[in-house]
């Protein structure tokens, strides 16, 4: 090292793709000796001197061998050491400290090489030296100290005392026994470190990381101990926001990083300017932790990482100036040694001897002073001096009271014998200690098993607690649902009571209305019966007139009577001339009359067919009239409902008499309608009578015709035969006449039957037609009445108003009586509702009181559960911390190491180091033999 100053090493990395893309070119020139560089920038041109300058293609091993190797040796010898890596973001600090791959011999960084160097130095040390190595890993993120080996420990405090100096309280320190264990610690810690992407670096460190190695050295023979701390600091890079593109959380991190680096620069300025009386270590947690490394008890190496490109000229110049200032810092490094028991005893003996000498000197001086005070004199040769006291020349000194010779004191009691142990006794002590260590290992194994069992029991208890919580939660849900259902049930019961009261009141009102309705129905039926009796006679008369008028149009009695007379004359003629012989002309005339009679019968048959067709037409007309009647009745009902609705709408604010007036008006309209219908029925009856008389006339004509036909047939049968010459012809003619007579008689009989049937059917159809016409006329009259009534609403309203005024005086008393009765009913109803509501209020108050009690109990339970949850949370946190330590596979038990391949248990000859704390706990060598030897 160059004196006791900080060693500053400068390292340049090659240009990256961003710098090449932006047109950057190298602007540095390193001299052949590697201690000076020239910066050829646009803003600044000049030289910088450092302890060593490494170019862009320098290997990791070369940087380590020159810069760091000696510091590791000093730390193992008991000195404190610090290695800084400083530079802008993306300048290669993390690559220098950690490397690309800690398992690659070429690219692994300074920290892996330091780890290997530490254990190599331990292995190369004498066998009587025992070493323990502890590792801790922390980061300073957003000005908060965070333990990377125990991420749950955040914002750790920084303390200071006389023995420890500045330290981080609560920082986890792990004992390690091999490089693999250190690498595992480094991997675990690096995984917890905060990194982020920026435009300058894809994995930019967002915090300062510090790896601290504590190496303790003990001489097992003498008991002397030394300890050294090695700080490996990877600083986060200084950032220019314009280049990194930081924003949001990354921007806040950049602010904190630049703040701590500024505080570091202020500390260096205060240490180097020679004028500052105060060094601002407390301005940043970084400078506070590294207080001993900057101007204190430490041997420090600062590695400044720079970019050679003109693209980052300003950042490179700032970094070089920082390193140049730091180079002038002077540290005061010393060995951190603990005195051995022998050295402490010698020091104690020396101090005791000096104390006795001073006491003797004080006593001699007091004696000389007493002589002078008594007026005596002391010769100059007997004056008290320190040299005489030191030499033990007490004869020439004046006597002093209380003075005792130290020699007599020394001989007054024998010295305590110092026991000396033989080699076999020392081996026995070591063997006993190893046995105790084995027992400790067994106890630790048993403790581990017990902890596992306890953990399983805790998990089981946690499971049961979760089950209990789920059951409790379900119970609470069911309880709440039950409470809600109870409330709903009570609400329903209360509503049912109110509904029952309302139903009772409605029943009473319904009974009153039913009684009134029965009375109205009775009055209406009486009025209908009276009106019906009055209109039945008129309707029958009208119906008879219409039937007579209708049947008169179908009276064929004249024609039938003429033909009947002709047929009867022919038959009479036949009867009168039975004894005479008929001539040919008579027979021809008779046949002609028979043919005419047959034609007349056919004509009447056709007439009957026409009547049948008319009957069918009347049936169709009947159906049509029935449809029209239904439509008119429907329209009448709709119009009536509309009229009633309008009347009710207009009567909302009127008196109750309006309803009576409307009922009276409707009854009058109904009576008028019944009267009109009765008149139409009477007309139809009269028409039916007329048709019946016509039918009787037709039947009489048919009877006459049949009689004439019979007479004619008889006359023909009584006609005598002609001469013998015409006998055959007459016989044939008689047969024809007989057939004709029979045919006419049969036709007359059929005609009579048909006439009767037709007349019955015609009479029935006429009755139906008359009834339909009467109904149609009645409906038309009702429709016209409704139209007239709707057109005269104003007059009807006036009449109703007058009627209401007339009836108002008579109904006042009735209204008052009804109002009084209704008020009494309402009072009773209100009293019942009030009683029900009071019961409801009392039940609700009881439920409220119960709910408050339950709420208090639930609050107490909740507080208890909250306390339990907090306890479990604390247990979980502690368990998490323990799990993180268990994940590292390490323990807090020290792992002593010895050099020259000496086995720690004094029983193995292979110099292998422990690789894991599970490989039979490392036995610590005893310090007792050395203590005994020092005695």
From Swiss-Prot:
Q: Does the keyword Oxidoreductase apply?
A: no
List GO BP terms, alphabetically: microtubule-based movement; mitotic spindle organization; spindle elongation
Xref: CDD domains? Khc_CBD_cc, KISc_KHC_KIF5
Q: Where in the cell is it found?
A: Cytoplasm, Cytoskeleton
Looking at the record, which segments are called Disordered? 400-419, 898-935
Which UniProt keywords are given for this protein, alphabetically ordered?
ATP-binding, Coiled coil, Cytoplasm, Cytoskeleton, Microtubule, Motor protein, Nucleotide-binding
One CC-aspect GO term: microtubule associated complex
Matches recorded under Pfam families? Kinesin (PF00225)
Indicate the segments annotated as coiled coil, or none if absent: 342-887
* Stated name of the protein: Kinesin heavy chain
- Per the UniProt record, the source organism is Syncephalastrum racemosum
Q: What is the lineage of its organism?
A: Eukaryota, Fungi, Fungi incertae sedis, Mucoromycota, Mucoromycotina
């Amino acid at each position: 090292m160059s004196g006791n100053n900080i060693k500053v090493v400068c390292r340049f990395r090659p240009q990256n793709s961003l710098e090449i893309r932006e047109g950057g070119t190298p602007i540095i020139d390193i001299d052949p000796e590697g201690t000076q560089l020239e910066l050829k920038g646009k803003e600044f041109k000049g030289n910088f001197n450092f302890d060593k300058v490494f170019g862009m293609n320098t290997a990791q091993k070369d940087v380590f061998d020159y810069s760091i190797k000696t510091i590791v040796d000093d730390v193992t010898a008991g000195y404190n050491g610090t290695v800084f890596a400083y530079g802008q973001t993306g300048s290669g600090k993390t690559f220098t400290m950690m490397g690309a791959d800690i398992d690659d011999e070429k690219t692994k960084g300074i920290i892996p090489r330091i780890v290997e160097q530490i254990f190599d130095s331990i292995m190369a040390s004498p066998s009587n030296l025992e070493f323990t190595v502890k590792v801790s890993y922390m980061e300073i993120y957003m000005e908060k100290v965070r333990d990377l080996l125990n991420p749950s420990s955040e914002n750790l405090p920084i303390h200071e005392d006389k023995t420890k100096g500045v330290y981080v309280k609560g920082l986890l320190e792990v004992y390690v026994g091999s490089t693999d264990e250190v690498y595992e610690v480094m991997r675990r810690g690096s995984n917890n470190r905060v990194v982020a992407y920026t435009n300058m670096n894809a994995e930019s460190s967002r915090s300062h990381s510090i790896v601290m190695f504590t190496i303790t050295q003990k001489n097992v023979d003498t008991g002397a101990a030394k300890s050294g701390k090695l700080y490996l600091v990877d600083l986060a890079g200084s950032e220019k926001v314009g280049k990194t593109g930081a924003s949001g959380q990354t921007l806040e991190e950049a602010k904190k990083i630049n703040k701590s680096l500024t505080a570091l620069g202020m500390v260096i300025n205060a240490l180097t300017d020679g004028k500052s009386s105060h060094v601002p270590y407390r301005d940043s947690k970084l400078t506070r932790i590294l207080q001993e490394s900057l101007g204190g008890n430490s041997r420090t190496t600062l590695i400044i990482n720079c970019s050679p490109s003109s693209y980052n000229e300003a950042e490179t110049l700032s970094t070089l100036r920082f390193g140049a200032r730091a180079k002038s810092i002077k540290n005061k490094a010393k060995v951190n040694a603990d005195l051995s028991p022998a050295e402490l005893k010698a020091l104690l003996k020396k101090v005791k001897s000096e104390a006795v000498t001073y006491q003797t000197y004080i006593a001699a001086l007091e004696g000389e002073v007493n002589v002078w005070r008594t007026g005596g004199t002391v010769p100059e040769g007997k004056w008290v001096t320190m040299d005489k006291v030191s030499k033990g020349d007490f004869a020439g000194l004046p006597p002093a009271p209380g003075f005792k010779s130290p020699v007599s004191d020394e001989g007054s009691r024998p010295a305590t014998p110092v026991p000396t142990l033989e080699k076999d006794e020392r081996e026995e002590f070591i063997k006993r200690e190893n046995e105790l260590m084995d027992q400790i290992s067994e106890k630790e194994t048993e403790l581990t098993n017990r902890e596992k069992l306890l953990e399983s029991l805790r998990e089981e208890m946690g499971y049961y607690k979760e089950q209990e919580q789920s059951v409790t939660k379900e119970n609470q849900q069911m309880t709440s649902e039950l409470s809600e259902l109870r409330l709903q049930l009570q609400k329903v019961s209360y509503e049912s009571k109110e509904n029952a009261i309302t139903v009772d009141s409605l029943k009473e009102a319904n009974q009153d209305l039913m009684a009134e309705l029965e009375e109205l129905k009775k009055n209406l039926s009486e009025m209908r019966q009276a009106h019906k009796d009055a209109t039945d006679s008129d309707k029958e008369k009208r119906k008879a007139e219409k039937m007579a008028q209708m049947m008169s149009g179908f009276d064929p009695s004249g024609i039938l009577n003429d033909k009947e007379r002709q047929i009867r004359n022919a038959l009479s003629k036949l009867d009168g001339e039975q004894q005479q012989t008929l001539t040919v002309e008579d027979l021809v005339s008779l046949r002609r009359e028979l043919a005419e009679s047959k034609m007349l019968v056919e004509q009447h048959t056709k007439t009957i067919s026409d009547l049948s067709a008319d009957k069918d037409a009347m049936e169709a007309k009947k159906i049509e009239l029935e449809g029209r009647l239904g439509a008119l009745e429907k329209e009448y009902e709709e119009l009536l409902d509309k009229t009633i609705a309008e009347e009710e709408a207009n009567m909302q604010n009127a008196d109750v008499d309006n309803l009576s007036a409307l009922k009276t008006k409707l009854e009058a309209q109904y009576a008028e309608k019944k009267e009109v219908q009765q008149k139409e029925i009477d007309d139809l009856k009269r028409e039916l009578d007329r048709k019946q008389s016509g039918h009787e006339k037709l039947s009489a004509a048919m009877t006459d015709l049949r009689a004439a036909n019979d007479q004619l047939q008889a006359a023909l049968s009584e006609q005598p035969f002609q001469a013998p010459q015409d006998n055959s012809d007459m016989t044939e003619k008689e047969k024809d006449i007989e057939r004709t007579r029979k045919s006419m008689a049969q036709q007359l009989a059929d005609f009579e039957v048909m006439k009767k049937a037709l007349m019955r059917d015609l009479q029935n159809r006429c009755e139906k037609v008359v009834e339909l016409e009467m109904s149609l006329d009645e409906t038309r009259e009702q429709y016209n009445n409704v139209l007239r009534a709707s057109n005269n609403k104003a007059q009807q309203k006036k009449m109703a108003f007058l009627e209401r005024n007339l009836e108002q005086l008579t109904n006042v008393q009735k209204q008052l009586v009804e109002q009084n009765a209704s008020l009494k009913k309402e009072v009773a109803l209100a009293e019942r509702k009030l009683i029900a509501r009071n019961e409801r209020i009392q039940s609700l108050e009881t439920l409220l009181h119960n709910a408050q009690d339950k709420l208090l109990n639930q609050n107490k339970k909740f507080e208890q559960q909250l306390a339990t949850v907090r306890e479990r949370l604390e247990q979980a946190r502690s368990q998490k911390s323990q799990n993180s330590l268990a994940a590292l596979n390490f323990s807090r038990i020290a792992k002593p190491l010895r050099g020259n391949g000496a086995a720690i248990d004094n029983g193995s000859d292979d110099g292998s180091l422990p690789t894991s704390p599970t490989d039979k706990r490392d036995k610590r060598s005893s310090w007792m033999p050395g203590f005994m030897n020092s005695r």
